[in-house]
A protein has these predicted regions:
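Membrane-embedded multi-pass helical conduit in multi-pass membrane proteins
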Residues: 13, 281-371
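Catalytic donor-sugar/metal-binding loop of nucleotide-sugar-dependent glycosyltransferases
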Residues: 202, 211-230
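N-proximal low-complexity "stem/linker" segments adjacent to membrane-targeting elements
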Residues: 1-39
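The conserved acidic donor/metal-binding loop of glycosyltransferases
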Residues: 59, 113-117, 202
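Long helical/loop segments within the catalytic core of UDP-sugar-dependent glycosyltransferases
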Residues: 71-108, 120-204, 215-216, 237-276, ...
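Short, acidic, metal-binding catalytic loop of nucleotide-sugar glycosyltransferases
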Residues: 39-50
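Cell-envelope/extracellular polymer assembly enzymes that use nucleotide-activated donors
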Residues: 19-22, 52, 194, 209
Length: 374
């Protein structure tokens, strides 16, 4: 694995001769956001003769009609926009991205899910960072959440996502160990994608799969705290559960596929352990749920639990609190989310949410989880 330096210049300069860039927007039945996504891509500050926008439209509802009119308007303004329709949804998002790549030879490929909106200067800043690191396969931006204040659920999710980006992703990048491409808000170097074997749809986490395969091929990545890309969080528990269940299944699939090659690779021990921990993180939900249930039993009349076991439960609980606060408080302050009281209220909902996910996932009937783009 290449040891990329994390010391990317704060404002790296772009070369005089800019490369061609392809912007891919995969969409499936998202009529409320497809036009906004196209307009955001069109507003990116990049020479028009070097920018191609692909709408990878697998929809079977009115999304396609809205897209046809939006694409027509953008073409009338002089932009190159390719509205890609497939005969079937084979490979789902990964299949759509691969099909789009086959239609354009641009050396750099930005990917945005339809409900994510980049600022107009995002492409110039992200490309500058990527070009400054010749062995970087991709650049990933932090994601800001436009509906983070919608309700208690989005506030709890934002707290966890802030910890993921501002602590986990940033630390992994600075430590030169593999970190995630989050499926949106980033740019791929085509040469790295092709060397790693391209997009694969044999897991539900095609982005994580590709990241690890590029690292195994000797590439690295760049993480940017700024500029952030604005996205949306699930506002309903059912939507959140489906999203998290899909991610959990995808992580397990990637672990089965790649942990062997990772541990047989020449990566550092730190990188191997960090990646293994990341792939196994989804297992924390049932562990925390069981631990909290046992703790509750021990509080109510000791529940017949041995004194030593009760003591161990409290030590475990204290350790979990330290991890939760350590991961979330720093990110909360770094991103100026508010005061301590507001933080405590939001943080208190996280264990409840984890228990809900563990119980909800255990209750699933084993049917394949519906595919989505985020």
């Amino acid at each position: 694995m290449v040891e990329l330096s994390s010391e990317v210049p704060a404002t790296p300069s772009l070369p005089a001769d800019l490369p061609a860039v392809l912007v891919q927007i995969p969409v499936y039945n998202e009529p409320a956001v497809v036009e906004r996504a196209l307009e955001a891509a069109a507003a990116l500050d990049w020479p028009r003769d070097l920018l191609t926008i692909q709408l990878l439209d697998d929809s079977n509802d009115l999304t396609t009609d809205i897209a046809v009119h939006a694409v027509s308007r953008l073409r009338a303004r002089g932009l190159t926009v390719d509205h890609v329709r497939r005969a079937d949804r084979s490979g789902f998002k990964a299949g759509a991205l691969a099909a789009g790549l086959a239609r354009c030879d641009a050396p750099f490929v930005a990917v945005f899910d339809a409900d994510f909106v980049p600022p107009s200067d995002w492409l110039r800043r992200a490309m500058a960072a990527l070009l400054a690191a010749p062995r970087a396969a991709f650049v990933q931006s932090r994601i800001e959440w436009g509906n983070g204040e919608a309700n208690w659920l989005t506030r709890a999710q934002r707290l966890m996502q802030d910890a993921h980006f501002a602590v986990e992703q940033d630390t992994r990048f600075r430590r030169a160990v593999p970190f995630q491409f989050n499926g949106t808000g980033g740019i791929w170097r085509r040469a790295a994608v092709e060397e790693a074997g391209g997009w694969s749809h044999d897991t539900l986490s095609e982005d994580l799969d590709l990241v690890l395969r590029t690292h195994l091929a000797g590439w690295g990545g760049v993480f940017l705290m700024e500029p952030a890309v604005v996205g949306e969080l699930p506002q309903r528990l059912d939507d959140f559960r489906v999203q998290q269940s899909r991610w959990s299944k995808g992580f397990v699939q990637v672990a089965r596929k790649l942990l062997g090659p990772i541990w047989r690779s020449t990566w550092s021990t730190e990188a191997k352990i960090a990646t293994t921990v990341s792939l196994c993180t989804q297992g924390i939900f049932p562990v925390v749920a069981i631990g909290l249930i046992c703790l509750a039993i021990s509080v109510v009349g000791h529940g017949g639990l041995a004194a030593g076991f009760r003591a161990a439960l409290w030590i475990w609980f204290a350790g979990m609190l330290v991890i939760l606060i350590g991961m979330t408080w720093g990110a909360y302050r770094r991103l100026n989310r508010g005061g301590a009281a507001r933080y405590l209220v939001t943080a208190a909902s996280v264990p409840v949410l984890i228990c809900y996910l563990a119980l909800a996932n255990a209750d699933q009937d084993g049917n394949e989880i519906g595919r989505a783009h985020v």
